[in-house]
Amino acid sequence: MKYSRIVVMGPPGCGKGTQSSLISEKYEIPHVSSGDIIREEMKKSSKEATVIREMVNSGRLAPDEIVNELVLKKIRSMSKYILDGYPRRIEQAGMLGDDVDLVIFIDVDEDTCISRICGRNEGRDDDDEEVGRKRCMVYNKETAPVLEFYKRHGKLLTINGCASPGTVFEEIRRSIE
């Protein structure tokens, strides 16, 4: 495979984590999930954790300054990674700079995302329809400029994410090999 630093983007419930894990396993590239990093931070009893919990549980994005520090700390020492869920804002894309070879956008309509979110039974506080719809709204508002940014730089690969996970992964595999 010709890419070593890959970002996987898409709306909540599109399958970012699933596809990132499949890519990671197939190509032996570490998977870094910004969502996992944030959820781990939320378990702590710090002031930052309280702020993150309040924002995430109401469907909003965690503050950039906290997320940037957590994610960049994790990936800066890595020569290869699959990063999912980051960047979500154009400023975050700027923080990554040239540390991205390819951005895979998993394109899924909102109703499919909501259905997946409500049906995944992971026990997450943000896995209900109302919060899911708000998360999709925030995603569409905040992330569209990021996708355009990577498209302008010739780094965006759009994949239809409405099929089964195996079918979606095969389309990704064919596109990146």
UniProtKB/Swiss-Prot annotation:
Where is region (NMP) located?
A: 33-62
GO molecular function annotations of the record: adenylate kinase activity; ATP binding
**Key words, A-Z:** ATP-binding, Cytoplasm, Kinase, Nucleotide-binding, Transferase
Enzymatic class: transferase
> Where in the cell does this protein reside?
Cytoplasm
| Alphabetical list of Gene3D superfamilies matching this protein | P-loop containing nucleotide triphosphate hydrolases (3.40.50.300)
**Disulfide-linked positions:** none
Binding positions (AMP):
S34, R39, R60, L61, A62, G85, Y86, P87, R88, Q92, R124, R135
EC nos: 2.7.4.3
SUPFAM superfamilies recorded = P-loop containing nucleoside triphosphate hydrolases (SSF52540)
Region entry LID: which residue ranges?
A: 119-127
> Which InterPro entries does the entry link to?
Adenylat/UMP-CMP_kin, Adenylat_kinase_CS, P-loop_NTPase
Q: Which Pfam families does the annotation name?
A: ADK
Is ATP-binding a UniProt keyword of this protein? yes
Q: So what does this one do?
A: Catalyzes the reversible transfer of the terminal phosphate group between ATP and AMP. Plays an important role in cellular energy homeostasis and in adenine nucleotide metabolism.
Quote the subunit structure annotation: Monomer.
Q: In which family does this protein belong, per the annotation?
A: Belongs to the adenylate kinase family.
Name this protein carries in UniProt = Adenylate kinase
Supply the source organism for this entry.
Encephalitozoon cuniculi (strain GB-M1) (Microsporidian parasite)
